[in-house]
Regions:
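Catalytic helix-loop patch of NAD(P)-dependent Rossmann-fold dehydrogenases
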Residues: 67, 102-139
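NAD(P)H-binding glycine-rich loop region in Rossmannoid oxidoreductase-like domains
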Residues: 36-82, 96-100
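SDR active-site strand-loop-helix element
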Residues: 7, 46-50, 88-94
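Adenosine-cofactor binding site in Rossmann-like domains, unifying the SAM/SAH pocket
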Residues: 22-39, 51
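N-terminal Rossmann NAD(P)H-binding glycine-rich loop of SDR-like oxidoreductase domains
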Residues: 2-23
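Rossmann-fold NAD(P)-dependent oxidoreductase module
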Residues: 16-20, 79, 128
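Conserved Rossmann-fold NAD(P)-dependent oxidoreductase catalytic core, especially the SDR/UDP-sugar
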Residues: 75-117
Length: 139
């Protein structure tokens, strides 16, 4: 049976995705101290749904967006590399490519034009992941 670790399972996307996945799904709370020590050895998949998208109170800083959307991605990816899991899935955002209305269709080859700290931090995470080398047996 597939064992999936779902990061951000309490958020909007993660909470909706969790019930749709097959196999055993474990929500991982990275706000818990030493959360890395609780990663099961037999996990097959890491799914990252962690993200800071909104600033409802008007108090979020650039650092807040980059920490949640970029720095934590690097931490999760390093944990993935150390684990026995084979698959890392990162959920990004259209904002990493475009945040304004565009007449042409967006494709994988579209040049990114993020405007906000949210979009820029999501784009930075995508670029980081695309530059990483994967050992044999991981994707």
């Amino acid at each position: 049976m597939i064992k999936t670790l779902l990061f951000g399972s309490n958020g909007f996307l993660g909470s909706h995705l969790q019930s749709k996945l097959d196999g055993e799904v474990i929500g991982v709370n990275i706000r818990q101290q030493n959360w890395q020590e609780n990663i099961p050895d037999d996990a097959n998949v890491f799914i990252n749904c962690i993200g800071k998208a909104h600033d409802h109170n008007g108090t979020a800083t650039e650092h807040d967006f980059y920490f949640a959307n970029y720095e934590l991605v690097k931490v999760l990816f390093e944990e993935f590399l150390k684990s026995n899991a084979q698959i890392f899935i990162h959920i990004s955002s259209i904002a990493a490519v475009e945040e304004n209305e565009r007449k042409e269709v967006l494709t994988e080859n579209s040049v990114g034009n993020p405007q906000s700290h949210y979009g820029k931090s999501k784009k930075a995470a995508e670029e980081y992941l695309l530059k990483q080398s994967l050992p044999s047996g991981k994707k």
